[in-house]
Regions:
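Sequence-structural signature of mature extracellular/luminal beta-sheet repeat domains
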Residues: 1-303
Length: 303
């Protein structure tokens, strides 16, 4: 696969969105801000959010919604790479933010659910009903781990519910083409989960002791990060250590596309045929573009 370098020297890049004008909006987690990358590769700062803006998505109102982890990682340079490390002592949790693109106004929608803090909001995806599923990655402290989970929330800030609890390290989240399945990548287990949707914002009850269905668990020591779904249903998950994108078929088989960064963190699709793919290579601060072998799934809301 031929890849093209779009931009470099970014502050731990994540949350890419392919916009209709050909630009890419992305988050710089380490720097607490969002950037816009023009088709020519020119970078401009869109808005300063503070904390650690991680995932990003366009909502039904055309606004930008952010899962902000609140600065849950301390970044450290290791052999020339920018690596997210332990949670800083002063970290109090994260939040969900709404950004009005024309004005740049930042509004906090949620920072807790049922009285419990959102420890490290990570990724989100809107359904066709206008609400969104999002993951809380949790965070690691000297006293142990604050566990995250899978949540559903309304875009107007009126309701948030916890759909699955006590997951190890929830990360990427996406929807099947028919909207009937939520996919969630768990970082530290290298596992891709599937949860059946029973009604808007509600998952089917778990079966036995398992919170959902396991699509596959990667062998060896591989972490999973953010994801995007193909139009045909494959789930493309950014893969750490075995740097690149792993495409999961629903039968559990996988196909790996290597990228030059052991901390490959995200992918998004765009272009007229949805075969343009942008991939975040975060420890080296780079964004790459390539032609994907199959079209990606068009999201429910775009701008």
């Amino acid at each position: 696969m031929d890849i093209e370098l779009v931009v470099e020297d970014c502050g731990f890049l994540e949350g890419p969105i392919a916009m209709s004008d050909g630009s890419i909006i992305a988050t710089e987690i380490e720097l607490g801000r969002l950037i816009r990358v023009s088709p020519s590769g020119k970078v401009s700062v869109l808005v300063e959010t503070g904390g650690g803006p991680n995932g990003a998505a366009i909502g039904p109102d055309g606004a930008l919604y952010i899962t902000n982890n609140g600065g849950s990682f301390h970044y450290q340079r290791v052999n020339g790479l920018n690596i997210p490390g332990p949670t800083p002592p002063g970290h109090k949790g994260g939040c969900i933010q709404r950004i009005d693109l024309p004005s740049g106004k930042v509004e906090k929608l949620y920072d807790s659910c049922d009285g419990r803090p959102l420890w490290g909001p990570n990724d989100l995806v809107f359904d066709k009903h206008g609400g969104f599923w999002f993951t809380d990655h949790g965070c690691t402290t000297p006293d142990g781990r604050n566990f995250g989970g899978l949540y559903y929330a309304k875009a107007d800030g009126s309701k948030i519910t916890r759909a699955r609890d006590h997951m190890i390290s929830p990360n990427g989240v996406g929807l099947s083409p028919d909207g009937k399945v939520v996919y969630m990548a768990d970082t530290q287990t290298g596992r891709l989960w599937a949860f059946d949707v029973a009604a808007p914002g509600e998952l089917a009850p778990p079966s036995g002791f398992m919170p959902g269905r396991v699509i596959a668990t990667l062998p060896g020591y591989q972490f999973l990060d953010s994801l995007a779904v193909e139009a045909g249903g494959k789930v493309c998950v950014a893969t750490i250590f075995n740097g690149g994108i792993t495409a999961f078929d629903l039968d559990g088989s996988t196909e790996h596309f290597a990228f030059p960064d052991i901390v490959t963190t995200n992918i998004c699709f765009g272009g007229s045929d949805m075969r343009d793919a942008w991939v975040c290579c975060s420890s080296t601060g780079k964004l790459f573009k390539c032609r994907w072998p199959r079209p990606g799934l068009k999201l429910n809301h775009n701008a």
